[in-house]
Amino acid sequence: KIPCGESCVWIPCVTSIFNCKCENKVCYHD
């Protein structure tokens, strides 16, 4: 898993367009 450099505490991952998913309040890429 690679951190996408984005948090998702208050808003969803904007980087989800790059297949980033929220996990433990941080956006990760599989």
Swiss-Prot record:
Disulfide bonds join C4-C20, C8-C22, C13-C27. This is a cyclic peptide. Keywords: Antiviral protein, Disulfide bond, Knottin, Plant defense. There is a cross-link at K1-D30 (Cyclopeptide (Lys-Asp)). InterPro entries: Cyclotide (IPR005535), Cyclotide_bracelet_CS (IPR012323), Cyclotide_sf (IPR036146). Belongs to the cyclotide family. Bracelet subfamily. Probably participates in a plant defense mechanism. Inhibits the cytopathic effects of the human immunodeficiency virus. This is Circulin-D.
